[in-house]
């Protein structure tokens, strides 16, 4: 089936993309305003876009003609923390997606404890198995409703039980039990069903695959 995006309204194009670009990791962003009040919100338009320097991007929309709390906080303080979401915290994460009035502390409302970060002033969610301390590089505004937050990761926290070899940065990803976003509304997936494939160099590929062509 062919879809011409130019003929679709914004809701239809959103549904089409979020139902097909899956699974998407979830950035559970903790930020703070200029008075130190905390905000927590999940975003699934998120991924890492470089390892050196380590860069992540988060897509944040606007609300009511202005920036969402997360975007306003990030632009004001130029720092935030991305927490990744395990299945055990899925319900709490979903609660923080509620459209609370401005100034409400979602962490306090949901009873989520925090721990201090090392390099940024914004705390991390204590129960999250992975937290990325981030500093803002730039915000790219696209049209009137889309913003891409580009940030550098300055520190990473990983739950001890998921670290196989700290010196080599080997992580047992399965032990993180992370979830991902699927289609809207309300679609999620677990990361338990995984498989591995070793990447071949050209000589190996030629020997095992090329001769069959």
Model-found features: residue ranges?
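Basic, polyanion-binding surface patches
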Residues: 1-213
């Amino acid at each position: 089936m062919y879809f011409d995006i130019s003929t679709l309204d914004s809701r239809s194009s959103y549904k089409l993309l979020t139902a097909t670009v899956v699974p998407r990791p979830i950035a559970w962003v903790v930020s703070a305003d200029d008075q130190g009040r905390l905000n927590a919100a999940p975003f699934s338009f998120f991924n890492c876009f470089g390892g050196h320097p380590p860069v992540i991007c988060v897509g944040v929309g606007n609300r009511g003609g202005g920036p969402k709390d997360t975007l306003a906080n990030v632009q004001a303080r130029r720092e935030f923390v991305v927490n990744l979401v395990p299945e055990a915290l899925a319900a709490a994460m979903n609660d923080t997606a509620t459209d609370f009035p401005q100034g409400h502390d979602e962490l306090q409302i949901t009873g989520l404890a925090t721990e201090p970060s090392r390099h940024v002033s914004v705390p991390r969610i204590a129960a999250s198995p992975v937290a990325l301390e981030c500093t803002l590089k730039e915000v790219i505004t696209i049209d009137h409703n889309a913003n891409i937050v580009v940030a550098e990761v300055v520190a990473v926290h990983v739950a001890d039980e998921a670290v196989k070899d700290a010196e080599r940065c080997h992580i047992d990803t399965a032990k993180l039990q992370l979830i991902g976003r699927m289609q809207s509304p309300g679609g999620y997936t677990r990361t338990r069903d995984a498989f591995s494939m070793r990447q071949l160099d050209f000589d190996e590929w030629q020997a095992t695959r090329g001769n069959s062509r």
